[in-house]
Curated annotation (Swiss-Prot):
It is found in: Cytoplasm. This is Putative gluconeogenesis factor. InterPro entries: CofD, CofD-like_dom_sf, Gluconeogen_factor. Belongs to the gluconeogenesis factor family. One of its GO terms (molecular function) is LPPG:FO 2-phospho-L-lactate transferase activity. GO terms for cellular component: cytoplasm. Keywords: Cytoplasm. Gene3D superfamilies: CofD-like domains. Residues 1-27 are annotated as: Disordered.
Amino acid sequence: MSAPPAPPPDRSAPPDRTDSAQTEPTRPLVRRARRARMWLEPGLGVKRWIFLFVVCTFVGAVAFLHFTWTGPLHPLATKWILWLNQFAEPGVFPLYAVGMVVMALALAGALYSITMISRAMLRGTGTAPETAVNVLYERKTLSRGMRVVTVGGGTGLSNLLTGLKTHSSNITAVVTVADDGGSSGRLREALDMVAPGDLTDCYAALSESPALARLLLHRFGRGEGLEGHTFGNLLLATLSEERGGLGTAMQDIHEILKVRGRVYPATTRPVTLVAELADGRTIRGESRFAEQIRPSRIERVRLEPENPSALTQVLEAVRDAEMIVLGPGSLFTSIIPALLIPDIARAVRESPAPVVYVASLMTEPGETDGLSLSDHVNAITRHLGRTPDWVLLSNSKIEPAVQRRYQQEGATVLTLDGAGRDLRGRVRFAPLIQAGTARHDPQKLAAALMQLWDGPPRRFSLPGQRD
């Protein structure tokens, strides 16, 4: 797979000293010309109104001329024309040229006044006039992007959303809400609500404002009752309490946060994640998995209470999706729990959209120890009832120092073993790793998914091969 396109050159960089004197005075004019040209880009819905304005102005001018020449203003119109005639010069500047100059000045004045009115209105709404065309162009372009539903939770999902929002605004994140530890667990127990932590991360990832994203993720380091909580978690808890539930508060949340896309909990009912192990034991509560699973392994996970309902908005998004992405994230605690909602699982099974599983880079200590990629896919198939159409796996090498750091915590690189040849035709390799980490690069991952959406790749890769 080809790497994502290089970023555009920094046009704000200073020009060479040799021509700086010539370039500097023209910069404002060049920037204005570029902005003016952008208003004429296809898809903005502006050119039709410019055309209508020109036509109406011409018709209005002709009608006004007819009115003044045939109506009670005829004497005044005659004096006006005679006054203009004094500026004419036969053979050099004829009468019709005088009229054209006056008409051009009048049109320029009208356009200037409309521009200033628009700028004043934009400033009143908090939008910088200089960036209005860029914002409009970006939103129009993103509104035509892929309709994608992402399923999961944790850092993996928020990373994915960070990359996807640069390609589309038609994003629906379906977030697992079974966490029972940390700030989420405390709020869940105190207010009988779903865990808000992963929802907060997704809202921050889709936020158009970096300042708002930082605010949502701010974690209080002191204060009785506040220490350990993030502002975003408290905001979601407040809206859930005020509106009588998180489900009814979702529209308010989206309007307040102005995110690029939609974020929904997999269910609005507080649920507990239960793991059934190979040795017959049962563990209740996600926060206990890592410590209590070993030396056994997970056979199946389920929710208590069973058969929680899903939001209507989630089911509609799945039905309308052009791609459904599972992960990246923890297999048994982030991805599969959302697929245990019967309505969501049924909608995904019946959807004509391709289902893409973004494989983790490392195993989860105590959760997926010793599992290969084919084991991951089999677990998804077993719980969902549908095998992913695509499996996206990174072929970038994790730096040895990073691997050693993870190995000290009990994590190893996820591999595609011999049994993985059963996945032939489904696996797609791409360089997805963020340099110096064992995490997916948001932009590389989004670019790989967009390539899958644009059309099936010409060939697939198996271990040992490279794109």
